[in-house]
């Protein structure tokens, strides 16, 4: 059995609401200032197939709760609520239409933007296609060039292989020659070892000879006077420039003096020109500083028919009847070149070229 369900909607309205309702009903707003609470019934649609008569009865029962208020008051309160619902629906419809219009505008703008973007992308794709075509053509040309180069490289490789084969053959020939050279080298090394041993033996002999030579030089040093290694004179001889001079302490005739100088591997000294400020003059003063006045020495200049020096130089002069030989004579402090009988006995001066110290 279906039971009747009563819905009661109770709303507590504050003072401002009461004043607004009273103003609408044309009542005094201060009529309800006694603190009474006003109950308002709201019209609701039927729920779950409840008939409108039942809803009306429910509302009627709710209206009976406040028996003190008249029926006119109830109707006046109910009518404005229903009037407020209708403008709300109209406003919602307007907002809905406005939203639909804005949505359509957005869709239109979106479609335009998509179209423009489509055109841009299409142009970019066309440009990309042209670039790809150019690139493809370039790649084809490069590919053909690479194929040509590979063919050339293959030919070069074949040529290199042939050259490698020839080089290998030449290398084998060189290896055989190298082996032969190694054999010769080993033989040379054996000879070198023998030569080295011989050289060591010769070196030992050379050292022994050098030692003997050093000992001999030490023994010979007292017999030689050396200004340097290339200018040496026998002991007792006087060195002047690159010549050695020997002044005898004994007297002999000219011929014996010449022979005595020859036994000493020398010859009689020659002084071609003797005059003050001449080289020979100064040399005689340095050679015979202690020579007193009247001292004479045989020299190599003899006066036969022709004045012939012992060094084979010629000087033509008138000769005397008897054989005369040259001598150097000191008178006081002057040296002169004079003639003397070759048989006279005088000291003599021998001259020889300075020599290198014996190695």
Swiss-Prot record:
Disulfide bonds join 233-244, 261-350, 325-342. One of its GO terms (molecular function) is transmembrane signaling receptor activity. Residues 117-359 are extracellular. It is a single-pass type II membrane protein. The modification Phosphotyrosine is found at residues 7, 39. Phosphorylated upon engagement of the B-cell receptor, probably by LYN or SYK. Phosphorylation at Tyr-7 is important for interaction with PTPN6/SHP-1. It is found in: Membrane. SUPFAM superfamilies: C-type lectin-like. Pre-B-cells and B-cells but not terminally differentiated plasma cells. One of its GO terms (cellular component) is plasma membrane. Pfam families: Lectin_C. Residues 232-352 form the C-type lectin domain. One of its GO terms (biological process) is cell adhesion. Keywords: Disulfide bond, Glycoprotein, Lectin, Membrane, Phosphoprotein, Receptor, Signal-anchor, Transmembrane, Transmembrane helix. Glycans are attached at residue 136. Co-receptor of B cell receptor (BCR) that plays both positive and negative roles on B-cell functions. Recognizes the Sm/ribonucleoprotein (RNP) self-antigen ligand, and coligation of CD72 and BCR inhibits BCR signaling. Mechanistically, ligand binding leads to the recruitment of PTPN6/SHP-1 to the BCR complex which is inhibitory to BCR signaling. Also acts as a ligand for CD5 and thereby plays a critical role in maintaining regulatory T and B-cell homeostasis. Homodimer; disulfide-linked. Associates with CD5. Interacts (tyrosine phosphorylated) with PTPN6/SHP-1. PANTHER family: B-CELL DIFFERENTIATION ANTIGEN CD72, CD72-RELATED. This is B-cell differentiation antigen CD72. It comes from Homo sapiens (Human). The gene is CD72.
